[in-house]
Curated annotation (Swiss-Prot):
Keyword Transmembrane (UniProt): yes
CDD domains per the UniProt record, alphabetical: 7tmA_DmOct-betaAR-like
Biased composition (Polar residues): 450-461
GO molecular function term, any single one: adrenergic receptor activity
UniProt-annotated glycosylation sites, renumbered to this chain: N164
InterPro entries, sorted: ADR_fam, GPCR_Rhodpsn, GPCR_Rhodpsn_7TM
PROSITE patterns, per the entry: G_PROTEIN_RECEP_F1_1, G_PROTEIN_RECEP_F1_2
Compartments where located: Cell membrane
Name assigned to this protein: Octopamine receptor beta-1R
Domain of life of the native organism: Eukaryota
Pfam family, one: 7tm_1
Extracellular side: 1-111, 161-186, 245-270, 373-383
């Protein structure tokens, strides 16, 4: 029988006895005067209070020890309530400890992920800048955009990610309303500049692959400088001017933010959302997709053209063998150079495609949420989801140098040389058979020659170092010969008319 049932039965028995004019105590059955019934009435009231506390959930029904079978309640209501309060406080303390440990673990995970993204963006883009400055082969027109992109991505990490990291970790804004406007301006400015740089790189690659003969005339240093100037100036029209003047949001929200400096929210009006998202993402994204599609079409066409040239070269070789004409076959040698050139162009197109894919994966979710939340007033998004979307977009600034290092051999070799100069002890041991392909891809203008002269002067160097120096020198000589072949005039017949004139048996 539970405590609630026992109390109900005892209360009913006591009330009925009082109404009959006599009450029997719980220990015996003697009749007593009405004045002596006052303690019993108090005990009955105590029972009623127990019932009310149990009904309200303040006292657990399982407290069977509070009431013995056939015995009076010896514990007062106040004592039971006090004990129950102590139990509640103890349970709340254990819950607070569990919540505190889980919150600490969540903060640690946030710090680790955010710190990794910020460090990768800063160090990776700085490595790109230093590598292009140190190595002459990387100083080409395309890499002007790459270096400028690295500067924009590094500034995204320094000026935008750091403030967002403080909000994500602390959960509040601690820098005032003026710095709130500056942070939002820096965020929009450098993120838009990074996206526009990717758009310019896609246009540059389009002319380099689709119109290679006109490329030196189109992408001159003057035009590249003008493009970079526009890329760095145009985002200011979307960031500093409307944000600092308050045009980007509603009047009520602007006054609310100014009166509450501990709050920093980027809540925009519909007009600014449409214009800013179009200029920052949708228009550059459409341009990049169209450029890459044209590059893919051209790469596929040239690949078929190279296949036809290879077939024509094999037919010519077979005809010369049948006719026993001991003539040189320059077309076959030049055809190999053409294949090598096409292979490099396909790799460049593939790298561009990977950069574009990373760009769309990182920024598309954010801008979809951005435009939907701005146009839908009743839509509410959790703060955690908004923060995740922001940092997925930021991660694109850390991905670009990783893509260059992994998919571009020139940058991979330059990164290796730069890191070797910065951390010489990490690359102390010379590994045989490794790194030669990377060394052949770059010409650094003399360090290996200086190493060769030094080895000749000493004459008593170790065999390992001598082998490394000799292999480096021989690889440079071999690469010079290969470059001389690659710069030969392309005389491979490409059209059907030229094939027909060269060999009457050729058919398409």
């Amino acid at each position: 029988m539970t405590l609630l049932q026992r109390l109900q039965a005892m209360s009913a028995t006591t009330t009925r006895t009082i109404l009959e004019g006599s009450i029997s105590s719980f220990g015996g059955g003697t009749n007593e005067p009405l004045a002596s019934k006052i303690p019993v009435l108090e005990e009955s009231a105590s029972h009623a209070r127990y019932l009310k506390f149990i009904a309200d959930g303040l006292i657990d029904e399982g407290l069977g020890s509070a009431v013995g079978s056939g015995s009076s309640i010896a514990v007062s209501v106040e004592d039971v309530v006090a004990g129950q309060a102590q139990d509640i406080q103890a349970s709340e303390g254990s819950t607070d400890d569990a919540d505190g440990s889980s919150h600490l673990a969540l903060v640690f995970v946030k710090c680790f992920i955010i710190g990794f993204i910020i460090l990768a963006a800063i160090l990776g883009n700085m490595l790109v800048i230093v590598s292009v400055m140190r190595h002459r082969k990387l100083r080409i027109i395309t890499n002007y955009f790459v270096v400028s992109l690295a500067v924009a991505d590094m500034l995204v990490a320094l000026c935008a990610m750091t403030f967002n990291a403080s909000v994500m970790i602390s959960g509040k804004w601690m820098f005032g309303s003026v710095m709130c406007d500056m942070w939002n301006s820096f965020d929009v400015y450098f993120s838009t500049a990074s996206i526009m740089h990717l758009c310019c790189i896609s246009v540059d690659r389009y002319y380099a692959i689709v119109q290679p003969l006109d490329y030196p005339l189109i992408m001159t240093q003057r035009r590249v400088f003008i493009m970079l100037l526009m890329v760095w100036l145009s985002p200011a029209l979307l960031s500093f001017l409307p944000i600092c003047s308050g045009w980007y949001t509603t009047t009520e929200n602007y006054k609310y933010l100014k009166s509450n400096p501990h709050i920093c929210e980027f809540k925009v009006n519909k007009a600014y959302a449409i214009v800013s998202s179009s200029m920052s993402f949708w228009i550059p994204g459409i341009v990049m997709l169209s450029m890459y599609y044209r590059i893919y079409q051209e790469a596929d066409r040239q690949e078929r053209l190279v296949y036809r040239s290879k077939v024509a070269a094999l037919l010519l070789e077979k005809h010369l063998q049948i006719s026993q004409i001991p003539k040189p076959r320059p077309s076959i040698q030049v055809e190999q150079s053409t294949i090598s050139t096409m292979r490099r162009e396909r790799k460049a197109a593939r790298t561009l495609g990977i950069i574009m894919s990373a760009f769309l994966i990182c920024w598309l979710p954010f801008f979809l949420w951005y435009i939907v939340s701005s146009l839908c007033d009743s839509c509410i998004t959790p703060r955690l989801l908004v923060g995740i979307l922001f940092w997925i977009g930021y991660f694109n600034s850390a991905l670009n140098p990783i893509i260059y290092a992994y998919f571009n051999r020139d940058f991979r070799a330059a990164f290796k040389k730069t890191l070797k100069s910065l951390f010489p002890y990490a690359f102390y041991f010379c590994r045989r058979g490794r790194g030669r392909d990377d060394d052949r891809d770059l010409e650094f203008g003399g360090p290996s020659r200086r190493g060769t002269n030094g080895a000749q002067r000493t004459g008593s160097g170790s065999a390992e170092m001598a082998n490394c120096v000799n292999s480096t020198a021989s690889s440079e000589i071999h690469m010079s010969v290969m470059r001389a072949r690659q710069y030969a005039v392309n005389v491979t017949p490409t059209t059907d008319a030229q094939m027909q004139q060269l060999h009457p048996l050729y058919t398409n």
